[in-house]
């Protein structure tokens, strides 16, 4: 684009989209030099409640993802990716108006073209929408889906509570069977067991909406009689969403909560026997659980089974409230798809928070070193001179499908430094290429242990190296 046009375009950028500089702190911020960039330039910080996941964290994040994917493969879930932006109404209708997530925590944007949209605070509603939009009711039922991605909640940041965080989730749509509920609890349990740390499963049943309504009325009656003894928040909950009274952590409310009526007594025989079946399956699977009569999982879309996963090891921050340290949660949502405008489709799912899981994994790894596999390099590529650098990069690229793990640092010009790196990576062979080798179409293979070098044809190098490496596969190391 011609520069003049570009300049004109720049002029058109509405003021509100121009770079935001906090006014009060502008001077201070502009003077900051974080050792990067020029003096006088403002250094940007990651937004409050959000965090970068740096390469050094990879050793914790990678096993999470691999584990999630292996479980999905084994239990036959298909991967689904939904957009991070959705219509606001999708979450208002599914999660419910009176929930904290919808009332206070959504990042909402207004736009003439797309209307009121928000960053997704969770993915189950999106999966239900995609199930309908994608005509998945026509697939053989049930449809098993899994996702991995960032969620956004504009909450007050604190330990383990972020504004952008990752979740992995598993959903089963199109089957009403206690074995489905048990499978999802099993997946959550396995996810952590395979990572090497034990978790506690808390489980309850909240039955069907009509049973819950009767229970809510009873609970509200009970709390109304004790109104003068409960905390300010609970007084509000009593008016707005009595079920949330059971989430209260205030000391003054605990004795009242302990004596409160329990939802299980308001369940029909059919709901009770459904729940019993889920528990029987868990017994059969050897998944330990604790019945938690006050567990209701604040969202409107749940029916029957609800459960949460907690670390069984002390969490990163022992002072942290228990509700904040849940690693994951899930349950049955038989009415959601219909509520979203689809056909009646029984369903259930679980979502596990990865950021919190990583925190616990780190904490656990401090005491019990994890046997996380270290990458094993087969060869190291070293180069000397500009032309050799280009050829080395080309050869490294050509070897992508060779199955060999190749170490290199083409941006170091000293051969000595590069060979030291090769030593650090403990490779048995280094491939060295200089100007002379480029011209002659050859390459040097150096045995790192003996220091013996041989010159071979570049085209034959892959096969020769593979043959040499084979003796290590045969256990001759
Ligand atoms: P929920 O469905 O809200 O219970 O979320 C399921 C899991 O996602 C939780 O148990 C957490 O591990 C994780 N999670 C939820 N909200 C946050 C947050 N604000 N920051 C970090 N992780 C979260």
Language-model region placement:
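TRNA-recognition modules of translation machinery and tRNA-sensing kinases, especially anticodon-binding
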Residues: 2-477
């Amino acid at each position: 684009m011609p520069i003049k046009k570009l300049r004109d375009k720049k002029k058109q950028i509405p003021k509100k989209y121009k770079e935001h500089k906090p006014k009060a702190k502008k001077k201070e911020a502009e003077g900051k030099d974080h050792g990067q960039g020029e003096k006088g330039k403002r250094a940007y910080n990651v937004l409050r409640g959000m965090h970068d996941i740096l390469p050094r964290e990879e050793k914790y994040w990678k096993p999470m993802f691999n584990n999630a994917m292996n479980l999905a493969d084994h239990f036959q879930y298909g991967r689904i990716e939904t957009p991070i932006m959705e219509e606001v109404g999708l979450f208002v209708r599914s999660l419910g108006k009176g929930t904290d997530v919808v009332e206070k925590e959504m990042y909402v944007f207004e736009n003439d073209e797309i209307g009121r949209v928000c960053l997704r605070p969770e993915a189950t509603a999106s999966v239900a929408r995609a199930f309908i939009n994608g005509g998945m009711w026509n697939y053989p039922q049930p449809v098993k889906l899994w996702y991995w991605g960032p969620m956004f909640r504009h909450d007050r940041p604190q330990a383990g509570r972020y504004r952008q965080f990752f979740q992995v989730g598993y959903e089963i749509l199109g089957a009403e069977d206690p074995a489905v509920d048990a499978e999802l609890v099993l997946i959550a349990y396995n996810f952590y067991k395979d990572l090497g740390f034990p978790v506690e499963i808390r489980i309850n049943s909240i039955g069907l909406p009509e049973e819950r309504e009767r229970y809510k009325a009873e609970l509200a009656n009970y709390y109304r009689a004790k109104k003068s003894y409960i905390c300010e928040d609970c007084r509000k909950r009593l008016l707005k969403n009595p079920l949330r009274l059971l989430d209260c952590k205030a000391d003054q409310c605990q004795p009242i909560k302990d004596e409160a009526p329990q939802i299980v007594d308001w369940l029909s025989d059919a709901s009770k026997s459904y729940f019993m079946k889920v528990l029987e399956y868990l017994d059969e699977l050897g998944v330990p659980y604790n019945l938690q009569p006050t567990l209701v999982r604040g969202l409107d879309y749940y029916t029957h089974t609800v459960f949460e996963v907690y670390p069984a090891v002390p969490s990163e921050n022992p002072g942290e409230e228990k509700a904040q340290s849940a690693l994951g949660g899930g349950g049955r949502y038989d009415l959601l798809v219909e509520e979203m405008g689809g056909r009646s489709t029984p369903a259930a799912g679980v979502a596990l928070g990865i950021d919190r899981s990583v925190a616990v994994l780190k904490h656990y790894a401090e005491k019990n070193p994890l046997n996380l596999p270290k990458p094993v390099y087969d060869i190291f590529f070293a180069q000397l001179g500009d032309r050799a650098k280009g050829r080395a990069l080309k050869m490294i690229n050509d070897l992508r499908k060779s199955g060999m793990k190749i170490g290199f640092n083409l941006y170091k010009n000293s051969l000595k430094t590069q060979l030291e790196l090769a030593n650090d990576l403990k490779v048995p062979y280094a491939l060295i290429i200089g100007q002379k080798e480029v011209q002659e179409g050859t390459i040097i293979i150096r045995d790192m242990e003996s220091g013996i070098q041989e010159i071979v044809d570049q085209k034959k190098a892959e096969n020769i190296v593979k043959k040499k490496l084979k003796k290590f596969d045969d256990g001759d190391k």
